[in-house]
A protein has these predicted regions:
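Feature captures the catalytic cores and cofactor-binding loops of soluble hydro-lyases/lyases
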Residues: 1-147
Length: 147
């Protein structure tokens, strides 16, 4: 595999009506019906304010595979995301450097991204806790990303 990044175009989008119906299904039920495979695992936690049972997330997944601490392709994902997309990031589960912080999340929100699911770290936790933009991650660190 060559060094660098690749972008695969033309992914199939989920029907919006189906996404809206799916959003009402509890995540535990979804996990059970997937034979408990392909779910986030015990380390994945909501990092946003979700008191009162809110803060769920459903949408077409725009997936990103990146090196720990590298958020260049996440910027690209935000640029090509359509309103309602969920950006799902696999940063290898590394929590030494964040791949998303307050500024990139605000940019994503303005662009219509529904939220993030990150196998890796975020930073600026206080900003996420003060808001309701859905972001789930496996860790928090003060160390920022690099591009």
């Amino acid at each position: 595999m060559p060094v660098g990044f690749r972008w695969v175009r033309g992914h199939v989008r989920a029907d919006r009506a189906l996404v809206e119906r799916f959003a009402a299904v509890p995540v535990a039920i979804v996990s059970d019906n997937m034979n408990r495979m392909f779910a986030g695992g015990a380390d994945l936690r909501p990092m946003h304010a979700c008191e009162g049972g809110g803060g769920g997330l459903a949408g077409t997944a725009l997936t990103v595979l990146t090196r720990p601490g590298d958020n260049l392709v996440i910027h690209k994902a935000i640029d090509v995301a359509e309103p309602g997309d969920v950006i799902v990031v696999d940063a290898g589960g590394d929590t030494t450097s964040a791949v998303v912080g307050e500024l990139i999340a605000r940019h994503a929100q303005v662009c219509g991204v529904a939220g993030f699911v990150i196998n890796g770290a975020i930073r600026d936790l206080d900003a996420f806790r003060a808001g309701s933009f859905p972001i789930f991650a496996t860790g928090v660190t003060h160390r920022g990303p690099y591009k």
